[in-house]
Regions:
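Non-heme di-metal
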Residues: 1-170
Length: 170
C-alpha cells in the first residue's frame, strides 16, 4: 500500500544509511540503498496508479473526495507511528549526524511530498528543505559512482516508469 512504501521504514532507512555516512556497515548500507530505491519505485508507481484511477473513473474521483478525511487519518497514523519509532530508536541518544528530532522532521518533510503526489495536503508542519540532505544520494542511482565489480548494478531501474503512458497502451 502507499502508506507502507511512502512512509513506513523511512526512519529505519535513514538510520541505517546514517551508518554508511559514518563509514560503518557499508556493505549492508549498499543493500539497504537498493531496497530503498525499490520502495521508492513502488511508491511512485502506486501514486501514478491512484491518480490514473481517480482521473479516469468518476466513481473513484467521487470516492476520493468522500473518503479524504478517513484516508488522511490512515496516513496520519502511519506518520505518527514512524515518529514514535524515531523516539524509540534514539531513546539512549543520537548517532553522529542523526537524532530523533531530525528524523521526525524528515518524516514530516517526506509526508508533504508523498501526500502531494496523490493529491492530499499534509496538515502538519514540515521543513521546507530536507533535514537529511545526504539521504537523496542513496535514492538517486545516478549519484552513485562505483565500479561494477565492486557493487551491484542498479541500471535496471533507469527508465522503467513513464508518466505519459495511456490506459489503452496497457
Amino acid at each position: 500500500s502507499y502508506a507502507l512504501e511512502a512512509f513506513r521504514f523511512m526512519v529505519s532507512f535513514a538510520t541505517s544509511l546514517a551508518m554508511v555516512e559514518n563509514r560503518i556497515f557499508i556493505g549492508n548500507g549498499n543493500i539497504i540503498s537498493l531496497i530503498l530505491q525499490d520502495e521508492i519505485l513502488h511508491k511512485d508507481w502506486t501514486a501514478w496508479l491512484i491518480n490514473q484511477v481517480v482521473k479516469e473513473d468518476p466513481r473513484f474521483a467521487e470516492a476520493k473526495v468522500e473518503c479524504e478525511a478517513e484516508v488522511y487519518a490512515m496516513y496520519a497514523d502511519v506518520i505518527r507511528e514512524e515518529k514514535g519509532w524515531a523516539d524509540y530508536l534514539f531513546k539512549f541518544g543520537p548517532v553522529i549526524g542523526l537524532n530523533a528530532a531530525i528524523l521526525k522532521d524528515f518524516v514530516d518533510y517526506t509526508a508533504v511530498g508523498a501526500l502531494k503526489d496523490i493529491g492530499i495536503k499534509y496538515q502538519g508542519t514540515a521543513p521546507k528543505s530536507t533535514p537529511i540532505p545526504w539521504f537523496m544520494k542513496h535514492v538517486d542511482t545516478s549519484k552513485k559512482q562505483t565500479a561494477l565489480q565492486e557493487n551491484e548494478s542498479t541500471n535496471y531501474v533507469i527508465g522503467v516508469m513513464s508518466d505519459s503512458l495511456d490506459y489503452d497502451e496497457l
